[in-house]
């Protein structure tokens, strides 16, 4: 018998390691497990929006996490708070669920592939292009292209995505293929249990009779001599039988401490490729693909802001997008760069200065001079519009990296010579007009605040 509150605390701690910090803080941290009914665990979400998002995106993660912790497959049902849910947690004995997930590949273990991780959903950029090409080559011709394929890189950069994509591709083109994905930690735990229960032969048969073995985070084998010994023989058996091995790590083989030299040398038999953090263009592409996949309408300025602020890895990037979407929905305000900055202030306390856009400048100048945004793009030449428009063009030239043609296009498709004229005119006036200097300074301060 296990207290459900304690179980959920353990589950949350486990899931915190599996998702980005923004995703955990936004969606999982505020949940509570209320009860267990047959094979269902009742989980309280803070509001309807969070409940709907959890149902769509986190039910499988929760089910797998509880299964890993207890050996019991429970299926989450999300509810919102009611007076009944405020009652104290009740201790319940975990019972075996009524329905079991279907077995895959006959007697083989569940391949544990994530349906969302395919080559189609992978965003290619300069930092992962080679790793993607190598992974696709391996998927198209297992054990004939590169064997083993060793992919390394930092957390959340797409190593696991590529491994799952290889598995999906192989099974799509050969449904009878025996494909297994697992972490080195799970390999270690199963090996220890097999030794304890005198089932070493079963363990060896399980992982030496596959067509493709995808093993994640191999660096965790470091220092585990017996497990390294077992994996060494598993590797040899598969390689000699012309079966594909794909390995991932957070560092190249030569930098994994206390890894046996014989394993290190075998990891170097095939191809070693790395993945580096995505550049700005790739980060924007990742956000656009995520938004499209989730049917979200995200303004370009929001995606640009997030991409400029989050340059570490894909998990944090997508987590930040989800947090902004949630924040916008919960406070019932349209998304813009300012709202994004507010939503992300807790996770990027030392945020980089927001990249100003021409639209930002037009809005601020328009508010200052009481000019409508559309008037900046119209053909109006009255002084009440033309002069603020010239100031906005001047500031766009001074405060952004936009080209002259780009600035002109943002002001109703005007020619770049018009932008040059506006910049020269305002620059000349500023040399003698103290009042204009004060106005420009005031507007600039508002833009930078």
Curated annotation (Swiss-Prot):
Q: Which residues form the signal peptide?
A: none
**Entry's Gene Ontology BP terms:** DNA replication initiation; regulation of DNA replication
| Domain of life according to the entry | Bacteria
* InterPro entries reported for this sequence: AAA+_ATPase, Chromosome_initiator_DnaA, Chromosome_initiator_DnaA-like, Chromosome_initiator_DnaA_CS, DnaA_C, DnaA_dom, DnaA_N_dom, DnaA_N_sf
Q: What are the boundaries of the region Domain II?
A: 72-111
Gene Ontology cellular-component terms for this entry are:
cytoplasm; plasma membrane
Principal location listed in the UniProt entry: cytoplasm
Q: Where does ATP bind?
A: 156, 158-160
Q: Where is this region: Domain IV, binds dsDNA?
A: 329-449
Q: Write out the annotated subcellular location.
A: Cytoplasm
Any one GO MF term held by the record is:
ATP binding
Q: Which UniProt keywords apply?
A: ATP-binding, Cytoplasm, DNA replication, DNA-binding, Lipid-binding, Nucleotide-binding
Give the start-end ranges of region Domain III, AAA+ region: 112-328
Which Pfam family, an example, fits this chain? Bac_DnaA
UniProt keyword annotation of Isomerase present: no
Q: What SUPFAM superfamilies does the annotation carry?
A: P-loop containing nucleoside triphosphate hydrolases, TrpR-like
Quaternary assembly: Oligomerizes as a right-handed, spiral filament on DNA at oriC.
Q: Which HAMAP family match?
A: DnaA_bact (MF_00377)
Q: Which family does the record claim for this protein?
A: Belongs to the DnaA family.
In UniProt terms, what function does this protein have?
A: Plays an essential role in the initiation and regulation of chromosomal replication. ATP-DnaA binds to the origin of replication (oriC) to initiate formation of the DNA replication initiation complex once per cell cycle. Binds the DnaA box (a 9 base pair repeat at the origin) and separates the double-stranded (ds)DNA. Forms a right-handed helical filament on oriC DNA; dsDNA binds to the exterior of the filament while single-stranded (ss)DNA is stabiized in the filament's interior.
Name recorded for this polypeptide: Chromosomal replication initiator protein DnaA
